[in-house]
Amino acid sequence: MFKLFSTKYMRSAPVVAAAWITMTAGIIIEFNRFFPDLLFHPMS
């Protein structure tokens, strides 16, 4: 019963959206930490 509930809950839209936003923010933060000026570098 709990396994069915937890699997169903973990695949719901708010949980998936929160995980997606957290992973995207982490990738951007780490990229900005290793390459500080590339996110705002002018393309010229």
UniProtKB/Swiss-Prot annotation:
Any Pfam family hit: PSI_PsaJ
GO biological process: photosynthesis
Membrane topology: Single-pass membrane protein
Disulfide-linked positions: none
Transmembrane segments: 9-29
Subcellular location: Cellular thylakoid membrane
Keyword terms: Membrane, Photosynthesis, Photosystem I, Thylakoid, Transmembrane, Transmembrane helix
Any one GO CC term of the record: photosystem I
Lineage: Bacteria, Bacillati, Cyanobacteriota, Cyanophyceae, Synechococcales
Name of this protein: Photosystem I reaction center subunit IX
InterPro entries with a match to the protein in the record: PSI_PsaJ (IPR002615), PSI_PsaJ_sf (IPR036062)
Similarity section: Belongs to the PsaJ family.
Known role: May help in the organization of the PsaE and PsaF subunits.
